[in-house]
């Protein structure tokens, strides 16, 4: 008799369990931002085809554009069910404020990130992280924290970037967070020509303090592939490699020949709305192919 669970669509899960498996299997997980239904479908279908666990994430700004956190959560849940994906999928808040975290827990997200790196003092970051860890875990939700501001601009919030303090990373880790983002020279968005690269020395110091806690590499779209692989291989075997939405949407990242810019809508159609639908479908498939290449090149599931 066949197993009734084979081929059955999975429900959303929190990210903690898939990160534990990644740690044990010495591979990284991909986290991809979504801004709309088309991008959500492309990411889900790519993860299914690549048989890769997936963290699908949304910023507060993107959620506002889509109608709010509840609309975003319901859309993702419906897309997971409609596509019938069987790989584990977590819905994660990306760079959330203290207030955003409460809203996402209420909306049905299965994972949250509290970015306390922009608070006035580290103590505020510490206190609020502690509170949110207790709340999230009581709801079965995983939580990511951040120490040391990641450079560049993310969802309208700018940071000069800094190397995280290993001692502060340990204090946050000891609160029981499920994964930790720490600045090691990485930047959101476009990397400048004089970028010094990742500080693997600082990363080693942080790992020595936090042990087996999975670490997160933000700004992954601009980091050269050799540094990504070195980051995974030497220091961050269960890292959640974040592929930021801005560079992906420009079609400038991914393996050679695997840009993510969708093709133009078919020409010569008598009705404009038909061209729009055809173009949207082609865009989903084109993005999906580029994402599969990323997953197969940089990740193992």
Please give the residue ranges for each predicted region.
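N-terminal amphipathic/basic-hydrophobic helices that include classical n-h-c signal peptides
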Residues: 1-10, 291, 295-301
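N-terminal amphipathic alpha-helix/helix-capping segment at the start of soluble metabolic enzymes
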Residues: 3-30, 77
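Alpha/beta enzyme core
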Residues: 13-21, 36-62, 67-86, 95-213, ...
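Conserved phosphate/anionic-ligand binding catalytic regions in large, soluble enzymes, centered on
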Residues: 32, 36, 242
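Glycine-rich beta-strand-to-loop/alpha-helix junction loops that act as flexible
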Residues: 217-221
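C-terminal alpha-helical cap/extension of soluble enzyme domains
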Residues: 225-299
């Amino acid at each position: 008799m066949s197993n009734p669970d084979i081929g059955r669509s999975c429900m959303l899960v929190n990210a903690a369990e898939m990160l534990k498996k990644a740690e044990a299997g010495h591979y990284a997980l991909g986290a991809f931002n979504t801004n709309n239904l088309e991008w959500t479908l492309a990411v889900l279908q790519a993860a299914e085809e690549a048989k890769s666990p997936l963290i699908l994430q949304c910023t507060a700004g993107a959620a506002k554009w889509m109608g709010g956190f509840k609309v975003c959560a319901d859309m993702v849940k419906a897309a997971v069910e409609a596509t019938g994906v069987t790989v584990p999928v977590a819905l994660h808040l990306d760079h959330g404020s203290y207030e955003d975290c409460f809203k996402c827990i209420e909306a049905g997200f299965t994972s949250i990130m509290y970015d306390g790196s922009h608070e006035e003092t580290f103590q505020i970051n510490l206190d609020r992280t502690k509170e949110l860890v207790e709340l999230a875990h009581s709801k079965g939700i995983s939580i990511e924290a951040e120490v040391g501001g990641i450079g560049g601009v993310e969802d309208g919030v700018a940071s000069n970037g800094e190397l995280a303090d290993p001692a502060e990373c340990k204090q946050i880790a000891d609160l029981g967070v499920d994964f930790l983002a720490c600045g090691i020279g990485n930047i959101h968005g476009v990397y400048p020509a004089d970028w010094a690269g990742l500080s693997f020395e600082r990363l080693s110091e942080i790992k020595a303090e936090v042990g087996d806690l999975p670490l997160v590499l933000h700004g992954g779209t601009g980091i050269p592939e050799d540094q990504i692989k070195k980051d995974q291989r030497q220091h961050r075997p269960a890292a959640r490699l974040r592929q930021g939405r801005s560079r992906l949407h420009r079609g400038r990242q991914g393996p050679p020949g695997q840009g993510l810019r969708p093709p133009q809508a078919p020409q010569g159609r008598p009705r404009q709305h038909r061209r729009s639908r055809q173009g949207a479908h082609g865009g989903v498939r084109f993005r999906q192919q580029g994402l599969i290449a990323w997953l197969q090149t940089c990740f193992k599931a």
